[in-house]
A protein has these predicted regions:
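N-terminal Sec-pathway targeting helices
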Residues: 1-17
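N-terminal leader/linker segments that initiate helical-solenoid repeat arrays
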Residues: 22-108, 119
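Canonical positions in the second alpha-helix
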Residues: 73, 115-116, 150-153, 188-189, ...
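Short helix-capping/linker turns of helical repeat alpha-solenoids
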Residues: 77-80, 84, 94, 119-122, ...
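Short coil/turn linking the two alpha-helices of tandem helical-hairpin repeats
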Residues: 88-101, 129-140, 166-176, 202-214, ...
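Structural signature of tandem alpha-helical TPR/SEL1-like repeats
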Residues: 101-111, 138-149, 175-185, 210-224, ...
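TPR/TPR-like alpha-solenoid helical repeat scaffolds
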Residues: 128-136, 201-208, 242, 270-282, ...
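TPR/TPR-like (Sel1-like) alpha-helical repeat modules
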Residues: 254-266, 273-282, 287-311
Length: 372
């Protein structure tokens, strides 16, 4: 009996020892204690490799997205070509609401735009491309003429020309490229200083759904929008201002919206009209900018907002804003209720350019003096 009990105890102890050894091996199997007799768990290796690859991708992404703000340098415009441009623009804009595509007004103005553009006037070039592409000015080969104009524009404003090319590739307007090849032109345009390209790149970065790169992308987006805003793009200013409101950086929001009004953005004007309104409370997350209520400032911004909104098709700007509603604490000057663009638009038409000048410029550019 005793021998039997002893045998059971011995078997139990052996079983316990085997269990302890097995448990110990399981516990330490994934631990590298040094030397050559141990191996690292495949799971740990895979996790390390994945982390390393992700870090490398982040570094590469950051390098690819690195952005240094560049403003597009605009060459000086000749007074002679500006005579043609200003005359054409005045009548062109007055035809925008009631005119029909290919009508006598726009086709008659094409001559002045063409001659000015081919004499290096980038404003005439940009406007003429728009009028041709939209069909307002008739042409036997509009796509060919537009692309020839854009090649000429590249001599004065390469960034804008690259952005135009991106736009034409995007809609297949007479040019083709490999799939997604258009984005190379967009990035090039942004780097060279196109404000429109900078804004579009910012929007593309904002649409990426990736939490890990979010902070990095937000910083680049702000740089891009700031750069575009500084160069006169109103919607970039407004986007900046909204972002600053979300972050409760109200002083920055005020400056961004004020710049947006100068750049012709009606939404920025509305933000400031509401921001200075005494009815706007801190719980109004869309309009509160932490401003001292000022009914006259609010009223002036609202007048400007109404005009910019109603005349959006004319693309008016307000470079004279500081003479109308300077930022506080500057006092408000006298104001007749009109912005400078409005006075120009409602005023008399510029004088018709001298015919001898028109023909001389046409000859100078190798163009037909009658049609451009």
């Amino acid at each position: 009996m005793v021998a039997r009990i002893f045998k059971i105890i011995v078997i139990a102890m052996i079983a316990l020892i085997v269990f302890v050894i097995w448990a110990g091996m399981s516990l330490f199997r994934g631990i590298d204690l040094g030397g050559t007799g141990h191996s690292t768990s495949p799971g740990i290796i895979d996790e390390y490799k994945a982390r390393k690859i992700k870090m490398e991708k982040m570094e590469q992404l950051q390098a690819n997205l690195e952005f240094v703000c560049k403003h597009e340098e605009k060459p000086e415009l000749l007074p002679e070509t500006q005579q043609l441009y200003n005359y054409a623009l005045y009548h062109d804009l007055h035809n925008m609401w009631t005119g029909k595509r290919g009508d006598a007004v726009w086709n008659g103005l094409a001559r002045y735009y063409r001659i000015a553009a081919m004499n290096g006037d980038y404003k005439a070039n940009i406007r003429l491309q728009y009028l041709l592409k939209s069909g307002r000015i008739s042409s036997d080969m509009p796509q060919t003429e537009v692309h020839n104009l854009n090649e000429e524009l590249a001599k004065q404003l390469p960034a804008t020309a690259y952005y135009n090319l991106y736009g034409y590739l995007d809609v297949g307007y007479g040019v083709r490229t490999e799939k997604d090849g258009k984005y190379a032109y967009l990035r090039k345009a942004a780097d060279l200083g196109s404000r429109e390209a900078q804004y579009v790149v910012a929007d593309i970065l904002g649409d990426i759904n990736d939490e890990e790169t979010l902070q990095m992308r937000l910083e680049i987006i702000e740089k891009l929008r700031t750069c575009a805003s500084e160069q006169g793009l109103g919607k970039a200013s407004n986007s900046l201002g909204i972002g600053f409101i979300i972050d409760k950086e109200y002083a920055k929001a005020l400056e961004a919206f004020h710049q947006g009004v100068k750049n012709g953005d009606s939404q920025s004007a509305l933000q400031l009209a509401n921001g200075f309104n005494e009815k706007t409370r801190p719980d109004d997350k869309l309009n509160f900018i932490n401003l001292q209520p000022d009914l006259e400032r609010s009223y002036r911004y609202k007048i400007i907002e109404d005009y910019l909104y109603e005349k959006d098709y004319l693309q008016p700007k307000v470079p004279d804003l500081d003479d109308i509603v300077p930022l506080p604490p500057a006092p408000l000057p006298e104001w007749d209720g009109k912005i400078a663009f409005q006075r120009w638009f409602e005023g008399e038409a510029p004088p018709k350019p001298d015919e001898a000048l028109v023909r001389r410029l046409a000859w100078q550019a190798g163009l037909n003096g009658d049609t451009g």
